Amino acid sequence: MTLLNYYSQTKMAKGERFGYKTAILHLAPYKLSGKNVCPNASKACATACLNTSGRGQMNSVQDARINKTNACWKDRLQFLKDLDAEIKQLSKRADAAGFKFAVRLNGTSDLPWHRYKLDGQNLMQLNPDVQFYDYTKVFNYLDHGVKNYYVVYSHLSLIHISEP
């Protein structure tokens, strides 16, 4: 299963003007897969979610996002190994084309990737020449201490989705 979308979206292709090839990981947001990957989701966030924009409207895309989310939950260690291998492969491809490489792991999720370890290191530490970036609604994610991980705090709506 391919985990990352590699410069296949219009927004990501714009990064080439700045010397970057980019990849993004799309999981099934909020609780769409049965697992909550957006811990601080508000009604406004869930309503405005980009999950179904563009190609995201297609059933096959939604199924793939659910499958990736389930794979991440079922065997996180294997998921991290697969993700790391894909990052390394795409980074080499970007480098060979004369580009830097950037990865957004929370395309349609808000998980603490800086806390998930593989051989004692997170994905950012395993790939120091790759620039990672994300948006988050979890303020504590800003204090991660990883040099090549840029996180932007996104304002949290005061209206939260009520739990059943």
List PLM regions with ranges.
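Conserved Radical SAM active-site core
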Residues: 1-129, 140
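Structural preference for beta-strand elements that scaffold enzyme active sites
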Residues: 100-104, 131-133, 148-152
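Short beta->alpha junction loops/turns
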Residues: 110, 156-157
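Acidic, His- and aromatic-enriched active-site or binding-groove loops in soluble protein domains
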Residues: 125-137, 153-156
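Short loop/helix-cap segments at secondary-structure boundaries that form the rim of catalytic
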Residues: 141-148, 162
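Residue-level detector of conserved catalytic or cofactor/ligand-binding positions
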Residues: 157-164
